[in-house]
Amino acid sequence: MNELPLLRFIPFRRSDLVKMCLARGKLEPSTQQVFQNACSAIEQYFQTDFIQMRQGLKQAYAPLDPDADTRVVEQFRDTSDSEGLALLLGQTLDRANYEKITRDYLDRAFRSASLFKVRLHVDLEDFDEVLLYARGARRKEEMVPRIMGFFPKAVTFTNFDRVVLYIRFKEDADTKGTLGGCQPGSTMLKLFQNVPAADMEMLFPNTRVGMRWIDKLLIGVPAVVSGGVVMTTKLGATMVLLGSLLGFWFGLSREPVTLDKSSVVVLAAGMGALVGYLLKQVSSFRNRKLKFTQALTESLYFKLLDNNAGVLYRVLDEAEESECKESLLAYYFLLENAEPMSSAELDAAIEEWFAQTWNCKLDFEISDALAKLAGLGLARCVDQHWQVVTEN
């Protein structure tokens, strides 16, 4: 089993991280105030920094938003809006510690067995562009029932805490097919939680539910058996009569068949039984497929966190929060140590603290955090060793 990469995401709130750092009890009261002042400076810096990014994303997404209640003036519309949106969104998600899911990974996920025990089909050619980003990949184990809901088996799979889906619809999208609810030329954004890698098909708007071979057997075998019973019990007389008629018509028999009232009744009863049997099998197939579709819909109801413009605002907030957390952690550990530290030493100290104190293994982005501190004038590097600058 391949090991999953460590998370870049720090799963603690910014305000809690400040308290967690101070709870170490290694700073004097005056130095604690220095730390608090640095936290305020860091927060103000990123608030200003993300204002421009927020405006850029809003401007790029406005003409593509399927939920917009404002008119688009075509003569002022920038044709590069979609490309600009994809680029800006990718940069924002990277700062929010999301990882891009490659097409190769997505294809392998599509080929893997679904935990829903249904067959899902997605045609990516229905879209102009598809992008997927995920955060919080981890191994999970669940007991999945196998035969007739019994004999559960432990299944280990990769699960994502968060998944962002970006879809740009074609200008000539078929709104009468599986994309009935889409707006041609628009861009759809979705944010989901708790998504198994093997079930990513369910996130797409054109997902079609199919049936596995075991489900077809559960319908087909009883259908064949009951069909045999119907043939022998209810269609016996009808089949004999039809055989006699066909034999006479094709010259296989010289004995004429008399179609009296009772014969017609037998034929009608037999045909009625056959039609009723076929309708019952079609209904059984549709009901089973409807059951799977309902299970899929119920699952998505609890997994969907946000749509379209709401996704932008949410990931912007997460990106700002992540940048602040990384910077204040790097500053605190530099402030706590009297001696300057190399970036590797600082990185190891922070990761060890999370692992030992908070049972949280992560990959801290030390280079980015130190670059931000240097830009703010809160830290400087001398001979490849970093120290805080407190003369502010």
Residue ranges and their predicted role:
Residues A273-G276, K325, L329, F333, ...:
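Feature representing long, continuous alpha-helical segments
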